[in-house]
Amino acid sequence: MVLARVYYELFSHEAEWLDAHSGADAELGRQLRLEMTDGSRVFIAWAWGADGDGYHVEFAPHSFCAGAPEVDRDVSAWPLWSPLVGQPVTLSYVGEGQQVLAIRAAGAAAYCCSFGRGVWGMDELRVGDRPPQHDREPARGT
């Protein structure tokens, strides 16, 4: 899969924040859309498990949202995404529980997380250049 374009599908209030903070990490209430050079699409969003539990990051070839986004923002040229555009990308989960999804290509990476800034972020997908540190019990000896 060669990445052609990256879109943030947004609510209007999210677009206003992004206009003032372009290139920054983002927290999306809707979803992220990757478009490939072959015309295929990959949608990434926060999701609940089949039984209504198991909050996690999920990706699929179909939208997770009903209806069109209020704002469809092309972020392909942003510093987070530009190293990945035009490259074959892989998507893989980091760690357990499908909480962090890495999108990697040619030594660059973007991360989609169900938590950010050290706390769980229900109903949001955090997108950034590194996975956040999740609150965990300290390692022994610390």
Residue ranges and their predicted role:
Residues M1-T142:
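Surface-exposed, interaction-prone regions used to assemble/regulate multi-protein complexes
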